[in-house]
């Protein structure tokens, strides 16, 4: 995914889910796509842009550095894909342990999940 000229590629606060109610409304909508490691829960929004929340449970990724790495990977792939995504609130949630996964496998899973939300 290359950047397009004139498209803001930053990951601003406006593109993040922050509040518990925002996460709850996405989970309550009960729509999701499942990948190899992650599940992407989604809900359409009227804000004119896609927003992201990331949930990495300690039960599935015991070490903080692994949880932080997974969140960085998801945020980076979202940042790159956001201009082409439909206007949804997304919560990307880890659903299986990633002990034997490579960084490339995780990246591919996130890219494939986000690809389902292209306009």
From Swiss-Prot:
Catalysed reactions, semicolon-separated: Endonucleolytic cleavage of RNA, removing 5'-extranucleotides from tRNA precursor
Pfam families: Ribonuclease_P
Keyword Hydrolase: yes
Record-level GO cellular component terms: ribonuclease P complex
Keyword tRNA processing: yes
GO annotation, biological process: tRNA 5'-leader removal
Broadest EC class assigned to this enzyme: hydrolase
Primary role: RNaseP catalyzes the removal of the 5'-leader sequence from pre-tRNA to produce the mature 5'-terminus. It can also cleave other RNA substrates such as 4.5S RNA. The protein component plays an auxiliary but essential role in vivo by binding to the 5'-leader sequence and broadening the substrate specificity of the ribozyme.
Family per record: Belongs to the RnpA family.
PANTHER family noted in UniProt: RIBONUCLEASE P PROTEIN COMPONENT (PTHR33992:SF1)
Matches recorded under NCBIfam families: rnpA
Protein name: Ribonuclease P protein component
């Amino acid at each position: 995914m290359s950047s397009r000229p004139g498209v803001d590629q930053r990951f601003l606060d406006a593109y993040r889910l922050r509040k518990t109610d925002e996460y709850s409304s996405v989970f309550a909508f009960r729509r999701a796509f499942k990948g190899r490691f992650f599940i992407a829960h989604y809900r359409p929004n009227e804000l004119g842009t896609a927003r992201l929340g990331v949930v990495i449970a300690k039960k599935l990724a015991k070490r903080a550095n692994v949880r932080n790495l997974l969140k960085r990977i998801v945020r980076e792939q979202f940042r790159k894909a956001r201009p082409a995504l439909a206007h949804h609130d997304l919560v990307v949630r880890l659903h299986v342990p990633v002990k034997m996964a490579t960084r490339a496998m995780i990246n591919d899973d996130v890219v494939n999940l986000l690809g389902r939300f292209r306009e």
